[in-house]
Amino acid sequence: AIVGRPRF
């Protein structure tokens, strides 16, 4: 997961 993006 990348902080600043929705959980994918």
From Swiss-Prot:
Record localization: Secreted
Protein family (similarity comment): Belongs to the NPY family.
Protein task: CNF-Tx1.3: Potentiates ASIC3 (homotrimer) currents and heterotrimer-containing ASIC3. Is less potent than CNF-Tx1.1 and CNF-Tx1.2. In addition, it slows the desensitization kinetics of ASIC3. In vivo, intramuscular injection into mice enhances acid-induced muscle pain.
Species this chain originates from: Conus textile (Cloth-of-gold cone)
Cysteine pairings via disulfide bonds: none
PTM section of the record: The amidation of Phe-8 is essential for rat ASIC3 current potentiation. A synthetic peptide with Phe-8 not amidated does not potentiate ASIC3 current.
Keywords: Amidation, Ion channel impairing toxin, Proton-gated sodium channel impairing toxin, Secreted, Toxin
Tissues with expression: Expressed by the venom duct.
GO annotations of cellular component type: extracellular region
Tagged with keyword Secreted: yes
Descriptive protein name: Conorfamide Tx1.3
Annotated positions of the Phenylalanine amide modification: F8
